[in-house]
């Protein structure tokens, strides 16, 4: 599993060095951006699982309960992110990878919400849901991983989800 403290803030990724003449980010730059958002969401999910006491070995191929579902979702996200470098950059696929990681973080957030049962836990859960929705929009048919406003919205929502998880004590 990854170390959440080593993750890059996804809002710091668009530094302008990887743009085409038309001002569009290159596919490699988009990959780095989506991968960073995916790593952040996966790290958030891992930290949340640790918070509620779900060990990484709780993952099951066919999950039978909430804990195994959360651990399995995290494991799949970690594997998908690790395999990104094996393929050519594909903004749509890379954005879907980040979306899936964000969805894994929602599964973990559901567990933490029930575990913490505080206003901060509720807010962190809703921030996780918002990050997942924004990641889905960035990866969806309208964004296909290339739409700058949708990517920026997803990056900001991920950063907000991290901040909310920290306030809730999940991270």
Where are these regions (language model features)?
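Active-site beta-strand/loop architecture of penicillin-binding DD-peptidases
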Residues: 117
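Short, glycine-biased loop/turn motifs at secondary-structure junctions and
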Residues: 1-114, 122-171
């Amino acid at each position: 599993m990854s170390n959440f403290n080593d993750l890059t803030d996804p809002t710091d990724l668009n530094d302008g060095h990887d743009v085409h003449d038309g001002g569009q980010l290159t596919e490699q730059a988009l990959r780095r951006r989506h991968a960073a958002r995916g790593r952040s969401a996966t790290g958030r999910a891992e930290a949340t699982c640790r918070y509620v006491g779900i060990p990484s070995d709780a993952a099951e191929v066919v999950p039978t309960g909430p804990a195994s579902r959360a651990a399995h979702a995290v494991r799949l996200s970690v594997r998908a992110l690790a395999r990104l470098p094996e393929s050519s950059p594909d903004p749509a696929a890379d954005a879907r990878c980040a979306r899936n990681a964000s969805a894994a973080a929602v599964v973990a957030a559901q567990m933490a919400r029930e575990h913490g049962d505080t206003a901060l836990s509720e807010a962190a859960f809703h921030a996780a849901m918002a990050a997942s929705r924004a990641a889905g929009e960035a990866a969806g048919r309208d964004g296909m991983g290339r739409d700058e406003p949708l990517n920026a919205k997803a990056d900001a929502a991920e950063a907000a989800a991290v901040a909310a998880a920290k306030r809730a004590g999940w991270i």
